[in-house]
């Protein structure tokens, strides 16, 4: 067995970790759709899905079977290649972004020294999926939804990136593992509270979640940029949205709440519990807040979020310089 070298073993272990972690993320995203419906029913004083299986436990399986057997229809005058490519990009962009998240010591798919920049790149790639879907569908509502989504996402990605620069300045690194280790004594949410608030708001907007779901507003745009999608293509958009929620929640935990760190319990359990809490907060926000107008969303971003991130960055830089003296 001389062909089994240490380098080959390391590659196989990395591939195994990647497969396990990414499968867990996809599974969490799928189950979150069921959990969201149950929790929304609880918040709104009604029953959620409770007919398929015991207490609705097989509802997700029924939805998957239905999605597989739906007609995979493509509009007559659409661009077939781009129309097919868009949901694949939407599904994989934020899924690949999870590769830089350390779920416990030693368990990270890609321990990159430019981890935060890689995440911002993947978040920017998701904009192309929206633009491709809106333009290739040959539908006016789809195109309007894509224009809204791209403008909103590009705007809030500015605040998303700026809100992370304070964390990078404090940790002295773009590496996610280094950022977690730098929070051994104090979580970043305390010195970077305004950065966390801005990151959370921008994260909801980048995921196109309520109340920032104007690109998909049913009352205005008839479901927005994926109105022409059906079957598994729509399923990729649908699951991709929940994968984005899982990724953003995991990044909140990693960047601001100490990652896997915590007493008594194993590191992975701490990471999972913290991430599940923020996933539930996404659902609570959807159940609690109304949808504002599109101009109000953009105005809020540029007039409130941008100054807040700049002030946070300036204060962080001043504190670091003061401590260095």
Swiss-Prot record:
It comes from the Bacteria. Keywords: Cell inner membrane, Cell membrane, Membrane, NAD, Quinone, Translocase, Transmembrane, Transmembrane helix, Ubiquinone. One of its GO terms (molecular function) is quinone binding. It is an enzyme of class 7 (translocase). GO terms for cellular component: plasma membrane. It catalyses: a quinone + NADH + 5 H(+)(in) = a quinol + NAD(+) + 4 H(+)(out). The chain crosses the membrane at residues 11-31, 81-101, 114-134, 154-174, 186-206, 237-257, 265-285, 304-324. One of its GO terms (biological process) is aerobic respiration. It is a multi-pass membrane protein. NCBIfam families: PRK06076.1-1, PRK06076.1-2. NDH-1 is composed of 13 different subunits. Subunits NuoA, H, J, K, L, M, N constitute the membrane sector of the complex. HAMAP family: NDH1_NuoH (MF_01350). NDH-1 shuttles electrons from NADH, via FMN and iron-sulfur (Fe-S) centers, to quinones in the respiratory chain. The immediate electron acceptor for the enzyme in this species is believed to be ubiquinone. Couples the redox reaction to proton translocation (for every two electrons transferred, four hydrogen ions are translocated across the cytoplasmic membrane), and thus conserves the redox energy in a proton gradient. This subunit may bind ubiquinone. Belongs to the complex I subunit 1 family. This is NADH-quinone oxidoreductase subunit H. It comes from Escherichia coli O1:K1 / APEC. The gene is nuoH.
């Amino acid at each position: 067995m001389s062909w089994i070298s240490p380098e080959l073993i390391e590659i196989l272990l990395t591939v195994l970790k990647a497969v396990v972690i990414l499968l867990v993320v996809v599974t969490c995203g799928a189950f979150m759709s069921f959990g969201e419906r149950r929790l929304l029913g609880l918040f709104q004083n009604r029953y959620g899905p409770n007919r398929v299986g015991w207490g609705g436990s097989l509802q997700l399986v029924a939805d998957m079977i239905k999605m597989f057997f739906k007609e995979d229809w493509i509009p007559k005058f659409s661009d077939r290649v781009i129309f097919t490519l868009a949901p694949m990009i939407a599904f994989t962009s934020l899924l690949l972004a999870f590769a830089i998240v350390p779920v416990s010591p030693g368990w990270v798919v890609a321990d990159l020294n430019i981890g935060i920049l890689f995440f911002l790149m993947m978040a920017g790639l998701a904009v192309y999926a929206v633009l491709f879907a809106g333009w290739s569908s040959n539908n006016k509502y789809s195109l309007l939804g894509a224009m809204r989504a791209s403008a909103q996402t590009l705007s809030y990605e500015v605040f998303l990136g700026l809100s992370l620069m304070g964390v990078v300045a404090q940790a002295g690194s773009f590496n996610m593992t280094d950022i977690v280790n730098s929070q051994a004594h104090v979580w970043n949410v305390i010195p970077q509270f305004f950065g966390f608030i801005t990151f959370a708001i921008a994260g909801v907007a980048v995921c196109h979640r309520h109340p920032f779901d104007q690109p998909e507003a049913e009352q205005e745009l008839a479901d927005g940029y994926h109105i022409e999608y059906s079957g598994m293509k729509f399923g990729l958009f649908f699951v991709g949205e929940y994968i984005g929620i899982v990724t953003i929640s995991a990044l909140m935990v990693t960047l601001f709440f100490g990652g896997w760190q915590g007493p008594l319990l194993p590191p992975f359990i701490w990471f999972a519990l913290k991430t599940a809490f923020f996933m539930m907060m996404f659902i609570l926000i959807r159940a609690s807040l109304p949808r504002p107008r599109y101009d109000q969303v953009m105005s809020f971003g540029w007039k409130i979020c941008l100054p807040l991130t700049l002030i946070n960055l300036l204060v962080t830089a001043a504190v670091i310089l003061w401590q260095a003296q």
